[in-house]
From Swiss-Prot:
Subcellular location per the Swiss-Prot or TrEMBL entry: Cytoplasm
UniProt-listed InterPro entries: ClpP, ClpP/crotonase-like_dom_sf, ClpP/TepA, ClpP_His_AS, ClpP_Ser_AS
Any Pfam family: CLP_protease
Active site per the UniProt annotation: 111 (nucleophile), 136
PROSITE patterns per record: CLP_PROTEASE_HIS (PS00382), CLP_PROTEASE_SER (PS00381)
Protein name as annotated: ATP-dependent Clp protease proteolytic subunit
């Protein structure tokens, strides 16, 4: 995950999005596939975590809470990670709203994606069998005066400590273990992610 902000537009917005047509008492109504799934309380977090994508996810979480504060929300994650600040806006909203947010990893949940996966409601965090999960420490690159570089270096150390502390809470691992295991890129299979405490179960088929 990157301490620096990234404002790249998500590629999913540039792709051709399928439409779904439904028959209603007033005739036909069409939705793009993501809007239709949103009606079923399904949110997709795909691609790099950046400000634009985070704002969309946060808006959907808040909307679904207003629709029904007592019904679970399902957050499907396929992400290589991205901006810490963007990711934390999603994480804080997940913890803030009343509905439980069930997280599901499909494909990969790396860096900030893994952090958000682990931040789902206890007992409702899942991974598909051939997905991978990766945790590591925040990344940062700075230019400028030495005093400014020192300020940013201290800030990234503060963020690292905060993320490790939260990850320890969500996984049940000791903080010292988290600090050691996030020192470098640490890839896990679906089963390994369950053993580590990042998720609660591997989903092979729907019940």
């Amino acid at each position: 995950m990157s301490y620096q902000e990234n404002n790249a537009m998500p590629s999913i917005m540039d792709a051709l999005v399928p439409m779904v047509v439904e028959q209603t008492s007033r005739g036909e109504r069409s939705y793009d596939i993501y809007s239709r799934l949103l009606k079923e309380r399904v949110i997709f977090l795909t691609g790099q975590v950046e400000d634009h994508m985070a704002n969309l996810v946060v808006a959907q979480l808040l909307f679904l809470e207003s629709e029904n504060p007592d019904k679970d929300i399902f957050l499907y994650i396929n992400s290589p990670g991205g901006s810490v600040t963007a990711g934390m806006s999603i994480y804080d909203t997940m913890q803030f709203i009343k509905p439980n947010v069930s997280t599901v990893c499909m494909g990969q949940a790396c860096s900030m994606g893994a952090f958000l996966l682990a931040g789902g409601a206890p007992g409702k965090r899942y991974v598909l069998p051939n997905s991978r999960v990766m945790i590591h420490q925040p990344l940062g690159g700075f230019q400028g005066q030495a005093s400014d570089i020192q300020i940013h270096a201290q800030e990234i150390l503060t963020i690292k400590k905060k993320l490790n502390t939260l990850l320890a809470e969500h996984t049940g691992q000791p903080l010292e273990v988290i600090e050691q295991d996030t020192d470098r890129d640490n890839f896990m299979s679906a089963d390994d992610a369950v053993k580590y405490g990042l998720v609660d179960a591997v989903l092979n088929k729907r019940d």
